[in-house]
Regions:
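N-terminal (or domain-start) structured segment
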Residues: 28-119, 158-160, 166, 182-209, ...
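A ligand-binding cleft/hinge motif common to bilobed small-molecule-binding domains
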Residues: 102-112, 176-180, 207-240
């Protein structure tokens, strides 16, 4: 009798396993199906992350034959949008296109962060690296990094820089530069990338770090001067702009944009979405739209993306603590 019962139990376990596999397969086959997909951008429209999201959404919906709506949910340096993602149903119909700052900087800047970047989200893949540029106002008597550092050291705190807000990546980039060169700069936070760029153009501040795609149009109009890029090597499209690393060896900043899902989304859906996004990022038409805006394709799916988030988080923890940057 016991032998019969054991055999019967084994049959039940095997059947349950088959049902589980069948259920998993049906989930993958059934997604997406007659439902709008939301892609949350935790920033206002018009910024670098938003631009990336709209390009990816356009090509992704063509592959999925499904409508994808880009939903801008800005506020608190990305907290509002990522909290909305955390609270969404883990069914694969809500994702977020986020920059690195809400994932790697916010945990060290904000005391009561409403999400855990490592536990509350599935890290699908990075998609883009956003090269950074250090630009200065034309009136500043510094034509290279060495002259800028010398000028700043001659009057500590006398030079000011614009950021898009406390804890924003443009803030952290400047702090890292100051720490690496031993200079003291005055931080002037603005409410967003647009206002910070306009403040620099107006001469309210002397310098600013931001995405090449954001600042380069003003450089071409001679409203700003490009001092250096934060890439490890000179950019092919900007061969005359030196890197900061040419003066400060090892100095590199590589902001990124990537896609995350709320924790709990079934693995078959995650795998399907990952596959489709990676195909989008190889599409020549999509790549051209990115390169036209000085955006560099960088795909690190799954565990590679998680490792990047962890590495950058450790890096910015040191910068934030050294600069004593805190927000309630």
């Amino acid at each position: 009798m016991r032998s019969i019962m054991r055999n019967f139990a084994g049959v039940i376990v095997a059947a349950a396993g088959l049902l589980s596999l069948a259920s998993t397969a049906s989930i993958a086959e059934g997604w997406p199906q007659n439902a709008i997909i939301r892609m949350i951008v935790p920033y206002p429209a018009g910024g670098g992350t938003d631009v990336v999201a709209r390009i990816v959404a356009k090509f992704l919906q063509e592959r999925l034959h499904q409508t994808i709506i880009v939903e801008n949910r800005g506020g608190a340096n990305g907290q509002v949008g990522l909290q909305a993602l955390k609270q969404s149903q883990p069914d694969g119909y809500t994702m977020a296109m986020t920059s690195d700052s809400p994932m790697t900087v916010n945990p060290w800047v904000y005391k009561n962060l409403p999400y855990d970047p490592m536990k509350d989200f599935i890290h699908v893949t990075s998609v883009i690296r956003l090269p950074s540029l250090l630009a200065v106002h034309p009136s500043l008597p510094a034509h290279n990094i060495a002259e800028l550092v010398a000028l700043a050291k001659s009057k500590p705190g006398g030079l000011s820089y614009a950021s898009a807000g406390v804890g924003n990546f443009s803030h952290l980039e400047a702090e890292l530069f100051a720490q690496a060169t031993g200079i003291e700069l005055l931080h002037v936070p603005y409410k967003g990338t647009g206002p910070s760029s306009l403040g620099l153009i107006a001469g309210e501040v002397q310098l600013s770090f931001n995405n090449v795609s954001t600042l380069w149009p003003y450089v071409k109009e001679k409203k700003l001067v490009a001092l250096a890029v934060c890439e490890p090597k000179r950019m092919p499209d900007l061969p005359d702009v030196p890197t900061i690393a040419e003066t400060i060896p090892g100095f590199e900043i590589a902001p990124w944009v990537g896609i995350v899902l709320p924790a709990g989304v079934p693995k078959p859906i995650v795998d399907r979405l990952t596959t489709e996004i990676l195909e989008v990022m190889k599409d020549p038409a999509a790549v051209k739209q990115f390169t036209d805006q000085q955006l560099v394709v960088m795909t690190l799916p799954g565990e590679q993306f998680t490792a990047l988030i962890k590495k950058d988080s450790d890096k910015w923890e040191k910068v934030v603590k050294t600069a004593n940057i805190k927000m309630e």
